[in-house]
């Protein structure tokens, strides 16, 4: 009997955490659709699931990534915002803080533990007051100013330091990124996306695509459709285009 009571309590606790996560994500998603972060567009990977988002990132003007179109995916835990989401680039990105498989390494997505070896302060790590908006702002900052103290891609970090220390005379880092930017434009063309090339276009690209705000998200639509035991989306599925990017 005690065992049944304990299991029921655990289920109730899990449901409460998930309910809290759904409410937080629905609120954040609505906010980002109505007032996007400059240089980003967000969408749901599946219309009936708030726990997996797709992100389109436009390379900022006057940076190496200018004119680039980079796809990423964010996955949220059942106890969000108490635990951080993960973020993975689906487009190839040569950067000191992006692993070869696309996983993004950034302090704001790291759990709030004290780890002196990481070189990160506890205040730089995730906490429940952070939001997707603050994550996206951190990502655009990291693209321009990589953290080379503990790189995810050592080769990219070495190239970046050479490029930086030579005041741009060492072109290897820059040339790799330029090739990826050009390749990303081909992907944008396939998706029917116009890549912003000027500052004016860049700010315009982030604006909502509809003149009327979307109807309020019905939270009940999301409670029963997400299976936490489901396998993660395969690498093959993640690398393909989908309806969000083709809009």
PLM-predicted stretches and their roles:
Residues 1-14, 146-247:
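Charge-rich (especially acidic), low-complexity segments
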Residues 1-104, 108-118, 123:
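Strand-helix-loop interaction patch of compact alpha/beta domains
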Residues 30, 73, 88, 107, ...:
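Residue-level recognition of well-ordered secondary-structure positions
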Residues 31-39, 61, 78-79, 112-115, ...:
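Short amphipathic alpha-helical interaction elements and helix-loop-helix interfaces
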Residues 35, 46, 59, 71, ...:
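A generic structural signal for solvent-exposed, polar alpha-helical segments
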Residues 81-171:
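Histidine-centered catalytic/metal-coordination loop motif
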């Amino acid at each position: 009997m005690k065992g049944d009571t304990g299991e029921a309590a655990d289920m109730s606790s899990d449901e409460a955490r998930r309910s809290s996560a759904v409410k937080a994500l629905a609120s954040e998603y609505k906010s980002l659709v109505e007032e996007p972060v400059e240089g980003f567009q967000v969408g749901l990977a599946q219309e009936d699931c708030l726990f997996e988002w797709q992100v389109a990132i436009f390379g900022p003007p006057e940076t190496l990534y200018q004119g680039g179109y980079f796809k990423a995916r964010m996955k949220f835990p059942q106890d969000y915002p108490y635990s951080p989401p993960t973020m993975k680039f689906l487009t190839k990105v040569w950067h000191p803080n992006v692993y070869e498989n696309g996983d993004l390494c950034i302090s704001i997505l790291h759990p709030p533990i004290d780890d002196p070896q990481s070189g990160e302060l506890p205040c730089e790590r995730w906490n429940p007051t952070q939001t997707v908006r603050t994550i996206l702002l951190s990502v655009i900052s990291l693209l321009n100013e990589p953290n080379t103290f503990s790189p995810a891609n050592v080769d990219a970090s070495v190239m970046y330091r050479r490029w930086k220390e030579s005041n741009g005379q060492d072109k290897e880092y820059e040339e790799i990124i330029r090739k990826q930017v050009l390749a990303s434009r081909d992907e944008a063309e396939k998706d029917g996306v116009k890549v912003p090339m000027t500052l004016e276009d860049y700010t315009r690209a982030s604006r909502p695509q509809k003149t009327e705000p979307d109807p309020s998200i019905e939270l009940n639509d999301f409670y029963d459709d997400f299976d936490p035991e489901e396998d993660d989306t395969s690498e093959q599925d993640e690398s393909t285009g989908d309806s969000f990017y083709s809009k």
